[in-house]
Amino acid sequence: MSTLDAAYKNLVKEFYANANVEGEELKCWVCGKTFFVTPAYLAEILHINRPMLRNPLVYDDLYLEEDLLWEALSKDLEFSPNGNSINVSSLSPELRVLTIIMFHNLYPLSSTKYMNLGRALFLHNQISDVEIDICAHIFHILRKTVIRTDSRICIPFCCLVSRILKLKGIYPSADESPHPKPSPINLRTLNASIGHSKKEVKSES
């Protein structure tokens, strides 16, 4: 999140805490303002032309044949013992990079070691030119996060939610100014840290 968006941290939490699922829309209440979020609204603010899909896929609910993923992702693909997920490290370097981008931007996940078969199909469709209703997908993630009131491991799409709040005229109060970010590590500090780590390895050996 940028420095400006960091000021919205508490408002984003309020968004998820107060939202209710009403069919194919989220009824939201933040700072006394009520508004609705739908896939169509997301397409409007993100300037996305949605594909004409009668029933957009809900990737979390899908069960896949292993052969499909082996053919598209990797012949060396490793599945978990129960067959419900794949080992990310068994993907090619290019797909691992795409997976990390996917995890951080489109399909939040608390661990990047394994991904379930639904996320694997999402990855497969990205590299196979299969149409994805990304707005329906984002709405599904928002909806799922709202429903999981007691088990929110991560809060997804913080920047998107803060943008929605801005468009609705909802801003943080003056006493919620963001904390200053720490300065980045300079090259001298980085080299010193690497040298210190090498000394520790030698002493252990």
Please tell me what each predicted stretch does.
Residues 1-202:
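A structural signal for long, well-ordered, hydrophobic/aromatic- and basic-residue-enriched core segments
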